[in-house]
Amino acid sequence: MALRGAETGSFTTIDLCTCDPLTGETVFYKYGAAPSYLKKGGSVRRVTGASLPAGLRGNPAAPDVTRIRLEEGGSLVMISDGVADPGRDEWLMDLLAGWEGEDPQALAGLILAESVRREKLQDDCGIQVLYRPASREKMV
């Protein structure tokens, strides 16, 4: 990856995720990125990393890699650091724990509205929500 401004010490956070919709196998790759969240019922798990952003001098070559399984009926939420300040995301954990819906767009909208109310939009906000429905076989 070539980074613009590398000679001046520019850097960027990278937050990638792959998810197999059939098995739920999910892998997070994080370079200095904000936490992600896994929700199933009233339980919420925070997925974090310790690596520095990409492009910093002396940064290790590999991102933090976390492998998990997204359960059927579970949601995966990825945010940028403009949504919730690092270390101040308890409100988001509580919001996710109390969410009982299945519509990813509605959940993203709710997170954004609460972030605007709390954080006053001091940075850009990016929110992605993935919902893994129960298998059709179990629904019949």
Q: Which residues fall in each region the model found?
A:
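Extracellular and analogous surface-interaction loops
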Residues: 18-21, 68-72
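PP2C/PPM family metal-dependent serine/threonine protein phosphatase catalytic domain
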Residues: 1-5, 32-67, 71, 109-118
